[in-house]
Amino acid sequence: MSWVLHIAFQIQVEHPVSELISGVDLIREQILVAAGEALSVAQEDILFRGHAIECRINAEDPIRGFLPCPGTITHLHLPGGNGVRIDTAIYEGYQIPPNYDSMLVKVITYDRDRKTAIRKMIRALDEMEIEGVRTNLEFQYDILHQKDFQEGNFTTDFISTHYEL
């Protein structure tokens, strides 16, 4: 019998959520360790505070089975403000090829509790404008308005039980 062990040395995609609730810059810590330095914070000193939510805005069409939507971004307005973090590399004129990772923008909001973080995310998505390609922006916005989502009553079956796609 053979065994294969896979070790991935990358940070999780959701690391901004962990960073916001812990106050620890995980990328900085990863670089320090890679450079042979010690971590700047001890595990027992990390305290979790508040609530963070991440929405991934993708160039895809939820109504058509989340098919990819390549094209050119013709207009872009990203939200901002206290407790709103935007991770992206897109810009007006950005070309999305057909063979790509569909994630365009990660929007992360942080506040004292889930309800307030959701409200902040709703405002952020309401302010966001991406034109030229189809995205899942409106779909994410709709999910945030679902009572079950707001109350934390969801599983990995949420989309299939709340939407006919």
Question: What are the residue ranges of the model-derived segments?
Answer:
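ATP-dependent carboxylate activation and anion-phosphoryl transfer catalytic cores
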Residues: 1-165
